[in-house]
Amino acid sequence: GDYGSGLMWGARGVGAFIGPLLFRYFYGSSDGKLLSTIGPGIMIWGIFYFLIPFSTSLYLTVFLLIIAHCGGGAQWAFSSYGLQILTPDKLRGRIAGIDYTFYFSMYTISNLLIGYLATKYDILLLFRYFPMLGFLFGFIWYLQTFFVNIVHIVFK
């Protein structure tokens, strides 16, 4: 009901708030370390969203959402930060605007897609496949940035 929905929406916000703080605390505050957490952040989101359909209680679901959005919040914060440090001052506002436009466009499109697919397929099936897809994207991002960091270290 409304109580459960409110708790779950709140859990997303709590996770998105504390995620970047926790990642910064555990990974360090240098630019390279923060930017290297983007892939793991996406993977954490995927793992914990994948576990939600197996949850047996509202409070376990809330916990899983908090952890998932710790990863998602860190990913969004540090990818936005990465764009800011790599963008020249005179273009920064425009690039940030484009970033937010893409983010909210993809958020809308993915919600519409999942809403449509939920009318055709079992919602629990979708709740397993979409997080796996997110995890896969995070893993690919991690591998790409890992190898870029290795090449940078070796050839520096």
Stretch-by-stretch model annotation:
Residues 1-156:
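C-terminal transmembrane bundle of multi-pass solute transporters/carriers
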